[in-house]
């Protein structure tokens, strides 16, 4: 059996996520947008909770097409609040719409979301030395700077810890443990 990061466990959905997504550099702006929104949904919860609901989020939020999401109304959020496939936390659901509007405002100003995000790591993944999971930080100076810059651009639910989890999952930072099959 291949060695994996200890947080993965035995659930196939988690193994697949770890092996095929987590820590793999992603440069597609819309996929990065989806992930920053989903990371915001995780606040106070475990990632597996959000991962199990990801397809329901994609369906409810137009596959995270920022143009369509930005047009969602209060009535759309009311419907989302009735959707058992989502985390029914109004502020978190509204955050996705707010973040879509912030994303589009960046685009309107000529700022590409992928270039913006990757600029925090000089457009190169940071490969960390991770002998064991205990050395992995919850946030860094880089995630603090990203959080501040996103908030300045009107993004919400993008704190330092959320930004670091985003950086890990999207491959800006590789925090797979040394010896992991995905390192």
Predicted features along the sequence, with ranges:
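HhH-family (HhH-GPD) DNA N-glycosylase catalytic core used in base-excision repair
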Residues: 1-183
């Amino acid at each position: 059996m291949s060695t994996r990061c200890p947080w993965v466990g035995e659930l196939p959905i988690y193994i697949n996520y770890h092996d095929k997504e987590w820590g793999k550099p992603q440069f597609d702006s819309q996929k990065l947008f989806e992930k920053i929104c989903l990371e915001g949904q995780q606040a106070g919860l475990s990632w597996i909770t959000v991962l199990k609901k990801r397809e329901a989020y994609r369906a409810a939020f137009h596959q995270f097409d920022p143009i369509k999401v930005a047009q969602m109304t209060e009535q759309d959020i009311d419907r989302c609040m009735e959707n058992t496939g989502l985390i029914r936390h109004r502020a978190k659901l509204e955050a996705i719409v707010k973040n879509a509007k912030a994303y589009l405002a960046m685009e309107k100003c000529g700022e590409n979301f992928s270039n913006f995000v990757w600029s925090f790591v000089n457009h190169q993944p940071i490969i960390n030395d991770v002998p064991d999971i205990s050395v992995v930080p919850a946030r860094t100076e880089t995630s603090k700077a990203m959080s501040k810059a996103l908030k300045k651009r009107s993004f919400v639910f993008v704190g330092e810890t959320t930004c670091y989890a985003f950086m890990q999952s999207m491959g800006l930072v590789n925090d797979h443990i040394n010896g992991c099959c995905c390192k």
